Amino acid sequence: MSNTINSLLDDVPDDKGSLLITGRQGLFSAGFDLKTIQRGDPKAAIEMTTAGFKLLSRIYSFPRPVIAASSGHAIALGAFVLCCADYRIGAKGNFIVQANETRNGMSIPTPILEISKSRILKNHWYRAILNAEAYSISDSIDAGYLDEVVDPEELMVKALEVAKDLATLSHPHYKLTKDLDQKDVLEKMRNALGLPRRPILCGRCRNLHT
């Protein structure tokens, strides 16, 4: 799935518009396939998780605004996709947002930790990440997973409204500001994943800086 989404992102313009991510009704994302992780095939598990971590890095650093329309439960990697987006809208309902890795016998690697620290509010980070607390949709705003909650029938209407508004933000100035804000986090993520450092285009001198 991560490889498929990565391929789709190749066709998304990165110099105009905005990126809107959503899931199916009742489920935004449940994260990695635990059966793949638990079936005892280390190669398959490593390939799947590495592709997922690279996808998170790509969404987090996408040059245009990223809007997440959480259509239901956002669990494990799904919770971290919310952390990658620039504006997060959740559908009201009996849904949870939970980073449940430590409850499932999994440690959380550096790339995900860095993303979570940049989005989860400090007074909720231990509860949300280390203690794997499940948050209701309404409580997810206070934790830092979501920015806004709306009725389910209004989710895509609101998401498109926000996406259209943020699409008007100037390029490359939005990208330049985002790059500077994320530089330290992305450097730690790319070092952990063995990815090359991404140069940053200076808005003043128009040169690339690393």
Range-by-range predicted roles:
Residues 3, 90-95, 143-192:
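C-terminal long alpha-helix characteristic of the crotonase
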